[in-house]
Amino acid sequence: MAGGAREVLTLQLGHFAGFVGAHWWNQQDAALGRMAEDEESPGELCPDVLYRTGRTLHGQETYTPRLILMDLKGSLNTLKEEGNLYRDRQLEAAVAWQGKLSTHREDAHPKNPNLQGLLSAEGVRSSDGAWRAKLIQNIQNGKENSIKVWSDFLRVHLHPRSICVIHKYHHDGETGRLEAFGQGESVLKEPRYLEELEDRLHFYVEECDYLQGFQLLCDLHDGFSGVGAKTAELLQDEYAGRGVLTWGLLPGPYSLGEPQKNIYRLLNTAFGLVHLTGYSSFVCPLSLGGNLGLRPKPPVNFPSLHYDATLPFHCSAILATALDTVTVPYRLRSSMVTMAHLADVLSFSGKKVVTAEAIIPFPLVRGQSLPDILTQLGEATPWTSLSACGDSAGHRCFAQSVVLRGIDRASHTSKLNPGTPLPSALHACASGEEVLAQYLQQQHPRVLSSSHLLLTPCKVAPPYPHFFSSFSQKGLAMDSTPKGAAVQSIPVFGALRSTSSLHRTLGDLAEELSRLDLRRWASFMDAGVEQDDMEEMLHELHRLAQCYQEGDSLSN
């Protein structure tokens, strides 16, 4: 039992969702280990929201993610489907059969060298009840290219009920791929996989005291968009009234030289968005791409972050960092905000799609205060879009939920001496919360804004990629590259927003799809999609786009 926490069950559907999830759980694990060294945890976030306690066959207490994960055959590499934490090696060694034995050996997957330094007992509390985590080294430059699957860098143990492999499809290879939305829907129409998912849901849900809802990390670009749609439908049918927050994940970049892959991506994304919005509290696309269309725009740019957009290991780390920040409101110990409440704030009047934006890392400089930095950002929209919607500057914001984390209390308000002329109205504020609220009011007057200011930074300890060259261990911006250990934590400014930029994004997607000659892509339709389904999807996509016209607002 979670002891009063408002539990959340996480579902990860797809291989890129596995990449994002691996970084996400590594960050949670690193945050649990903050009591090590000389670091004091502010205790603002409640880990019991995401984790569950358990006990092994030998009585050892465990603390594992409340997680159901679905991926394809060949995606686990050396990770065992049942995990390692609850295995009884004595039982495994016992052989009851007395007859002749024949041995068939299959070459084991070589363990990725990046895993050699990872902790072997993650997810286990020590005898004194404290959490112990071991610092590990950064993955060496050049070796990041060797990371092919998310299990190569996952550093936490999972419960035996977490991993579900869809054996009828292959993760790698030219054939047997889960490529189309219709294929994904069909997976959960098979009793074998549907019953397995239902059993796992019941296992986790029945042990919760107060389940506030589900966070669904789902690949949109391939057949897992169909798996996600059927999963969201199941959650709505079985657990009506609970929040279902869906994060639609899109890797990148895309090549113009792969027409079938691009057309399938476009169709899967559109069908996924439409069906998921029908069964979710809201859907937030997450991508470092510049747009959703067939002609890719350059990946997004972060001024202080150097990443390789061709590496899923890099892209997923950035998206996980944003996700770890924007989900803060329903993971706080002190806040009464639930998933359902957050969705109500953002998704009124049919606006079931929201965007994610972030500054990673927030440019905190030693000696400066929060009013100083926000004033320097000026009136321009400071965030980088993470939803393939392009620059949000000039577009209307209807509602937003904003989180600024990793700012120490001494920097919350102005440090100017009494009598010094104030550079801005922000410098007159008496608290950090007031500074942030005033800044958002200046940025978007008359917009419904929910904001949270946290002391807790975002953990970016290894195996998180080494993105940051001019930052201290605690994420402070510096003029030169510091010597010593890698950056361990960073301040992050993140937002979920309902914005008129979605009118163009969704409308353009519908227009591109309406120009397709579906006769050329009969293989997609043969996977289980009818012409009527296509027409209904286009109609719904246009309807969604209309919800975000400039004239639409909370007041009318």
Curated annotation (Swiss-Prot):
Keywords: Cytoplasm, Membrane, Mitochondrion, Mitochondrion outer membrane, Phosphoprotein
Lineage of the organism: Eukaryota, Metazoa, Chordata, Craniata, Vertebrata
Protein name, as recorded: Protein misato homolog 1
A GO biological-process term: mitochondrion organization
Location of Phosphoserine modifications: S41
Subcellular location: Mitochondrion outer membrane; Cytoplasm
Family, similarity comment: Belongs to the misato family.
Annotated function: Involved in the regulation of mitochondrial distribution and morphology. Required for mitochondrial fusion and mitochondrial network formation.
Originating organism: Mus musculus
Gene label: Msto1
Record-level GO cellular component terms: mitochondrial outer membrane
